[in-house]
Amino acid sequence: MPVSMAVCETANVVNAALRESLGGNSSAGSSTDQAKSGEDTNGSLQNHIVANAKRILMAKIEYEEVPNYHESVLENLKSKYIVIKPGNPGAINGFSGKNNTGKLVGANGHDNNGARKQAEHPNNQSHHINHHNHQHPTSNPNELPKPKRVLYPRENIRIGWKQSERKWQVGTGMINVGNTCYLNSTLQALLHIPALANWLVSEQAHLADCNVAEPGSGCIICAMTKTLLATQSNQSAVRPFLIYSKLKQICKHMVVGRQEDAHEFLRFLVEAMERAYLMRFRNYKELDQLVKETTPLGQIFGGYLRSEVRCLSCNHVSITFQHFQDLLLDIRKADSLEDAFEGHFSRERLEDMGYKCEGCKKKVSATKQFSLERAPITLCIQLKRFSMIGNKLTKQISFKSRIDLSKYAARSQAAQAQPLTYRLVSMVTHLGASQHCGHYTAIGSTDTGSFYNFDDSYVRPIAMHSVCNTNAYIMFFELDLSQAASPAANRPNGVRLTNGHSTTPVPAATVSSPSPTRFIGPQLPAGGANGYTNGNAQKTAIQFKQQNQQSPQNGLQLGTGKFQDTAKPPLVGAHAKGEATSAPTANGNKSSSPSSNSSSNHKSINQQQYLPISSDDEDIEDEMKPRPTTAQLPSMPNMTENHTEPKAKSPVKIQVKTPVKTPLKSLVPYESASEEEEAPLPNPRKRPSGEDSSESDQESGQTNGHSKTNGSHTNGSASSSVHVNNSKQKTDAIDEIFKSLKKSADSDEDDDEEEPSIQLTNGWHPQKQSQSQSKAPPSPKTPPSPAVIKSKTGIWKVTRNDEVDAIEDDVDVVVVEGSPVKIPTPNKNHRNPFSSSKPSTDSPATPGAKRQKLLNGSALKSHQQPRVGNGYQSNATSNGSTINELLKQSYRGYGSPVLSWNGKPAELEKELLVDAREQRQRDIDDDEENEMDRGRQRKVKSGSAKGNNASNSTPGYNPFQEYEGQKRWNKNGGGGGFPRFYNQNYRQNFQQRNKFKFNRFGGPGSAKFQQQRALQRHLSAGGGFSRRQPSAQQQQQT
């Protein structure tokens, strides 16, 4: 029977015995009888009590189990007593109020006598936990112990900005009140963590009736909540005085106005918030550590590491659990965040014979490895950038906006059930060389997914790639619930997203082409042998949209016998839907039949972002001129002279110089219209888009003004057919060339000693034709054309005979006369590599040869030394309009400005312009410095080349200034051996006056040395000599 019934029956027996004894005493009459009867009564009472007690003790007591103590005993007692405190604190959160001995246990693990509960230690086998209304006699020491009380359930944490009903703003900046950048950046990083911000907003009810106050200050949680609401509501920067004023409360050793470490402040701030939350409970000091770790801050930032120490002698494994709120990663041997995680969670060997094994009972060698037993909701990572002596490790650590820590989780079913995918929400960065100096900034995310940089009171948006390239110090990652709900599947190789955002995997080979047939291997693009396509196919970019145009390019370009990869190998090429029906060419590519409108509908996506890259060998076949007609498919180049059939209007004959070397067969014998067909040409001297295709730079031996020779003959092989277009644009361009040639001829009538400069329209050095070849009859079908025409049959020269010279006013063309056929090898100039400084004395000067001038920036041939300033060779007396026009063009000898594929100036041209601008500025600065150092000077007339003293004149020599200087140095008398002012030694020393003030050399060696120095300075300043200067220098040296 129950214990209560046994106790009640014993009480009834005792009461009956007392009544019986009292009733017997009242019936006695005399005193003696009363005394005797009293003794007997006492004895009988004792006998009755002893007999009943013995019977009760000998009786069998049966116990029955009741479902709840409240329902059986306490509920019956409530009817007799007034309940002051409802419920039992020991039974909150489903925990039983009994321990294994049957005693009532309080909420903090103590029994009623104040004795500590024996089952508190996690390794104690008698640990009792009752979550499901039944007893667990033992707990597994290899599992994480569960707290007896949960202060704040983990399920109440709201992860992500979308979980809150509040509309979150970007947030304002914080004013730096004096070396508080560490405080501002830490607060900004914390307030941009969604889980923490959602919890602080939920604390507004506590904010209304907060009675928690530490000595000397208020609640730090309320201060954080007010600061968060201030940054969300204000439009200007706020002053975090609520946190700044509690700096001593947060950490006692932090001093106001002194620079502090942001991570140290973060740790003290979180601990102060935890302490403020625990102060809401009266017996918070009696709570054990497991219960204290269930605060909201512990649930947000807290996690548990599983430490496994394995003995190398007996393989005994000791498992312990460690609570953490941030991970400190060593980056000395890591280049990325993944490498740092690998090093942190890898197995490491402990000190030899430094671990005492529980199985061996002795010190042995062991290994230790960490793993994640319970991952936190918000993962805080601190990179160890500072050493104990204050030095900073400033190496760049790369990281991604999303990280996966599933492989570092403990090998338990509970840990592996949930994927550990985190996304970056905020970070703290440090700028500076050490921890004692520098500046802290913060980066935070918003509900829209964008990131902002918080630099004290300044707030500005920042791109994602800039965030990942930031030199981070503290990073906050929050658990990604979207990835946890739908785990990311492993994508196979060769599969990528269609537009970079969709999660549907699409094979890369079928993104932009529905055609099932596809050639695998190296392929050549249509339109050029070096990899430049003329359609809308891309060279380096991935094309995501399907297009109707086709191109057989697949990403590998072949140019002049070698593979070329300009940027990255393209993943996909552009193929047309009708590719299967098109005829394949010799190299395995599909030819393009409807390519006439291939460049008029679409442009390549990334073609305006990449500049074409080619080597010197590939410059021979670099570009393709646009053509308004459909593509042609010629076969091998036809080496015949009569290939064009234009109309003739002038007695100009065209001579063909056939190359000696046999041209190679074109690897791509087809061509299409270029995408530059619609691009405007800014240079008026550049041929328009509808010009003759015989001037295609791809088929000629030059590109952008470069000349390429092989030995003594030009490799003029070509693979394009000659297509004649009699448009008005062509005639206008030719007329412009003839007008410029006529102006050049008029300006050079007085030039007697200049050798004929044989330079053609775009920087070529043509071959000299013989007199016999120049006497050939002119072709009656030849139209006016420029000085050179490049076609598949070679280089076409434009000459005229004496009869043409007689009718010069009617047709202005160039006369090229000279010795038998040969190609002069030009001398290279480092400033103008396309100019030739070798004097031509083979043939006499003729009026026609004198008028052969520069047309596109090439240099003139002359016997004189080239001018150093701009790389041109010209006569000092020549000031014609052609030279002025040339000076307005490109100054490096490239001819007309070379544009990129998108019609903009090339990067090389921009760099050259910048160099020229800087050189001019340096020259101006040097002139100003020389003018300032020179002081006041006497005026002097410049010496005439025909004067009597021309042979004795030195460039820049001023005898009057030398005389004044001589008087200045000899005003005190003395100077016994100084010669008179008109001695030549003064002229030799005048530019070295500041260096040799008191040393006037009189020997011939010193005079020669000083004269050479003066000549070098004169040339470097951009000066020149007259035509008879070499003879004058020779006389001076003698």
From Swiss-Prot:
- Report domain USP positions: 172-480
**Keywords on record:** Cytoplasm, Hydrolase, Nucleus, Phosphoprotein, Protease, Thiol protease, Ubl conjugation pathway
Per the UniProt record, which EC number(s) apply here? 3.4.19.12
Localization per Swiss-Prot or TrEMBL? Nucleus, Nucleolus; Cytoplasm
Compositional bias (Polar residues) at which positions? Answer: 23-44, 629-641, 703-728, 832-844, 859-881
Composition bias (Basic and acidic residues) maps to: 729-746, 912-923
| MF GO annotations | cysteine-type deubiquitinase activity; K63-linked deubiquitinase activity
Effect on the protein of changing residue 439 to N: Loss of 'K-48'- and 'K-63'-linked polyubiquitin chain hydrolysis
What spans are recorded as compositionally biased (Acidic residues)? 747-756
Q: Which family does it belong to?
A: Belongs to the peptidase C19 family.
**Subunit composition and interactions:** Interacts with atms/PAF1, but not with CycT. Interacts (via C-terminus) with imd (via N-terminus).
Q: What is this protein called?
A: Ubiquitin carboxyl-terminal hydrolase 36
To which species is this protein native? Drosophila melanogaster (Fruit fly)
